[in-house]
A protein has these predicted regions:
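Conserved acidic segment of CheY-like receiver
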Residues: 14-25, 29-33
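CheY-like receiver
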Residues: 65-147
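Short, Lys/Arg-enriched N-terminal segments with co-localized hydrophobic residues
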Residues: 1-12
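A generic structural motif
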Residues: 37-46, 98-100
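Acidic, metal-coordinating helix/loop segments flanking the phosphotransfer/catalytic sites
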Residues: 30, 48-67
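Short, well-ordered amphipathic alpha-helices
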Residues: 27-36, 55, 87-92
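Conserved SAM-binding loop
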Residues: 18, 48, 104-105
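Conserved binding/recognition cores within well-folded domains
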Residues: 135-172
Length: 172
């Protein structure tokens, strides 16, 4: 199942994917996103997915997300169906996608070691609280702001600027 909701706020809109086979969890996360966006004046667009395959199809269509709130274990998970670890590997490997913050939302802590190569941004242990969602998104927004810092300089009487994270080295 796929659904999209947008919440208007003060910052650049971020796109969030919720991928969980538990409808109650999807609804809780959606409500937390709405509450957070209103309370903190953030602009969030989100989509819900019941399976990893549905989310992967979105990427195959050329769509992407800034944040993925991703379960690891899915009911009726046969050998042909992806779990959250496999989806993370595909996104990081096939698409060389390091920009998406993959956040595992799970009851299964034993997968933490398996996910190291995927470089998850965070783990949120179920049951989830609104406070934990706020903590995650505030950290995420701070990290994004740090990446957008600009270095300004003048060369040959022309003012220039460059995003600090794009600077490899300085020469004098």
């Amino acid at each position: 199942m796929f659904g999209i909701m947008a919440y208007k706020g003060g910052d650049r809109m971020i796109r969030v994917a919720i991928c969980d086979d538990d409808k109650h969890m999807q609804e809780s996360l959606s409500k937390y996103l709405l509450d957070y966006s209103i309370q903190c004046d953030r602009e969030i667009d989100h989509a819900e997915f019941d399976t990893c395959e549905e989310l992967m199809d979105e990427y195959l269509k050329g769509n992407s997300f800034d944040v993925i709130l991703l379960d690891i274990e899915f009911k009726n998970n046969d050998e042909k169906q992806m779990n959250g670890i496999e989806l993370g590997k595909r996104l990081r490997g096939l698409y060389a996608n390091d920009n998406t913050a993959i956040v595992y939302v799970t009851s299964y802590g034993e997968y933490a070691i398996d996910s190291i190569k995927i470089r998850p941004y965070d783990y949120i242990k179920k049951p989830i609280t609104y406070e934990r969602i706020v903590e995650f998104f505030e950290t995420y927004y701070l990290d994004q702001a740090k990446r957008k810092k600009v270095f300004e300089y003048t060369a040959h009487k022309v003012k220039n600027s460059i995003i600090v994270s794009n600077i490899c080295y300085f020469e004098s």
